[in-house]
Amino acid sequence: MMKMEVVFVFLMLLGTINCQKLILTGRPFLHHQGIINQVSTVTKVIHHELEVAASADDIWTVYSWPGLAKHLPDLLPGAFEKLEIIGDGGVGTILDMTFVPGEFPHEYKEKFILVDNEHRLKKVQMIEGGYLDLGVTYYMDTIHVVPTGKDSCVIKSSTEYHVKPEFVKIVEPLITTGPLAAMADAISKLVLEHKSKSNSDEIEAAIITV
């Protein structure tokens, strides 16, 4: 009888240890899987496309040019009240932008996340202010320049954002592809008017004279 009691106690102890191990190891797993403390959001994606009678390389040359950031006020006259650039214009560069009165959002920061020359792909993420103050937890612009012929391409722009459910009706009418469309229009116009300009100095001169 004594042996059976000892075995029973041992099994109980073993079970307790295993349960504790499950709790200790299982909780990080649940955190990792997003089951605990998960913030519920709604994902939205909006798109804009512009066909351009210029090569994808010519269009991408401007989009990927590190000097583009400092010339945004020249490319989009009247849009900015203030523009501060932190970085060299490449990946990791942060733009602190304040727009003219009456524009919304009035101020926010964005960061260049990706500049992929092979696939002509650029990603820019809003990291502070703007829609992030209105329940948006993630906001990413993507520009993809896709060739459709030797001297033709399409600029595919999109915005993906994640927003808390209670803010969806507030931000949905505000977030549009307008800024991406304005940039695509400005760059395509620049390239079409100055097709012979292919290096950085020529592009800079062309932008300044827009």
UniProtKB/Swiss-Prot annotation:
Optimum pH is 7.0. One of its GO terms (cellular component) is nucleus. It comes from the Eukaryota. Expressed most abundantly in the rhizomes and to a lesser extent in petioles, roots, leaves and flower buds. It catalyses: (4-hydroxyphenyl)acetaldehyde + dopamine = (S)-norcoclaurine + H2O. (4-hydroxyphenyl)acetaldehyde binds at D141. Keywords: Alkaloid metabolism, Hydrolase, Signal. It is an enzyme of class 3 (hydrolase). GO terms for molecular function: (S)-norcoclaurine synthase activity; abscisic acid binding; protein phosphatase inhibitor activity; signaling receptor activity. The active site is at K122 (proton donor). Residues 1-19 form the signal peptide. GO terms for biological process: abscisic acid-activated signaling pathway; alkaloid metabolic process; defense response. Optimum temperature is 40 degrees Celsius. Pfam families: Bet_v_1. Dopamine binds at Y108, K109, E110. Its EC number is 3.5.99.14. May be a member of a small family of three to five members. Concentration-dependent dimerization, but mainly monomeric at concentrations around 10 uM. Belongs to the BetVI family. Involved in the biosynthesis of the common precursor of all benzylisoquinoline alkaloids such as morphine, sanguinarine, codeine or berberine. Condenses dopamine and 4-hydroxyphenylacetaldehyde. This is S-norcoclaurine synthase.
